[in-house]
Amino acid sequence: MRVLKLISQILVFIACVYLAKQLFTLDEIKLINTKNESNESFSHDLIIKENLLTGAFNKTKEEASHLSLITSQIIDAGSDILLSIGTSNKLDMNFTQSPYGFEIIDYLESLRTIRVRVDDPVSFAQFLADNGDGFEFEQNVRLKLPAVPEQRILEAEEPFSGLSMNWLGAKSDRRESGHGIKVAILDTGIDINHESLYGLDYSEVSLLDNGIDAGIGHGTGIASIIAGQTDEFLGLAPSSEVLSVKVLNSDGEGDSFTIAKGIVLAVDQGSDIINLSLGGFSSSAAMDQAIQYAKSKDVLLVSAVGNDGTEGVLYPARHKDVIAVSSVDAKSRVSSFASYGPEVDLAAPGVGIVTAWEDNHFVEFSGTSIATAFVTGALAHELSKSPSQNKNVIIEALYSNLDETEKPGKDIWAGRGVVNLRRLEQRNTPGIVDAAVVGYYFDSNNLSSSGTIPFQVTVQNQGTAWIQSMSLKVNYKGLEKNFRLGNMSAGESRSETLYFDSDSPDKTLSISSELSLLGQTDVLPKNNVRKSSLILP
């Protein structure tokens, strides 16, 4: 029976290898200011095609023989394998020499993980069978840049262009923001000679074998949002120290061992926050250990949920100790390309963001990768105000001052809500009155039905003062509905339900909503009104 169990584990592994070949797209890059005049497009999204095979080798000699045979059949010569050594294992490092069928490539001591290349699968399998107690092994999974996402997806989104910082409510006098905070960017590398990054407090470590600096646009764009230096492209935390850890080569390819090694290096070099604008479908034991190592040192990790546009938050964003970031457009609508699931924590701007790029270019950058950079920058900004503050307190402050999206409460699309730096900055300032219409929510299960269908209009008190009394007026389909909302506490949200006839031949639904406050003056009246036009299925 135990032999059959081992065989079943191997078969599961083979299935994982097959499924991991499915690719996803995270980011769309459109060149907007370059030396050539073409409207060239780039895709710089990352995939970790991860396959995990974990074994606890407490077995008889017969079972070991079966395992050796099966393992040799699924591991080819040249395979890149990670061996995790249990703390109880006292093996001498000489075991890595011949005749055991593999060559050591690298070793991450803090995680007790060895990266090896298998030369002789049969000898390697026998080594595992003979020395398996306290060992786990997995393939060192690769990263890949898939094709450019379909442009039709982005055409339905409202781009931010150069207005993302104002939209977030970032202060113009933030040049000292980020002082005393170190941010690590694990990516393709950064073009430190870009005009928007002149003066950046910067260091770089490459974990790659070659020193080629081509293909570093993705990391450069991330860095410009976090710590851009010029007035035109001022980042959210321009005085932060940036550590660029190059874990992806010029083709945007890397592996889980190198990323895990990069996380450990960033932690050991004193980073406060690690930006991981990358992801994959399955987990990696080596990266799990690296994430736990970062947590033990009180280092924050921020990662993109992915751009697959379907349910399933990517790894490492879905790890419970990583902040998972989705994307919204300029109308605060969750991007249709963003992956979703219960692990999503929050959302930030991610459509048509103007950022730096390599060779002194500027691009429009779309994807959850760039949304992740906004969250990293916001955290660096807040941490710099109180460097000794417990980081969990800062995270809670960020979460408590997010804007609602279409559906009230935590949801699988935007998590707890959308980043609002203005609210975060002013959270301790009393007396701010700010009511907002935040959106409309349609349950997708209802849209395919006939007859009368409900939808919700959601409003939120985004100030710090109680709203004493306000009314909501909604116009749609020739109807006007009025609601008396009464009082609302700071941060509170409330929804009203309305109905429309789905059998109408006119599939366009135009909605206009307006809030009116009684006896109070709203400091930001423009968000009291929301007009939307939707095409119903």
Pin down the residues of each PLM region.
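Inhibitory N-terminal propeptides of secreted protease zymogens
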Residues: 22-149, 271-272
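Intrinsically disordered, low-complexity Pro/Gly/Ser/Thr-rich segments with frequent PxxP/GP/PP motifs
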Residues: 479-505
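C-terminal subdomain of the subtilisin-like protease fold in secreted/lumenal serine endopeptidases
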Residues: 31, 56, 61-62, 68-73, ...
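Subtilisin-like serine protease catalytic core
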Residues: 171-183, 190-203, 210-256, 319-321, ...
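Hydrolase catalytic cores
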Residues: 223-226, 247-248, 273, 336, ...
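Terminal connector regions
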Residues: 504-537
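Substrate-binding/access-modulating region of protease and related hydrolase catalytic domains
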Residues: 229, 247-321, 331-334, 340, ...
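Protease zymogen maturation seam
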Residues: 59-67, 71, 103-111, 129-182, ...
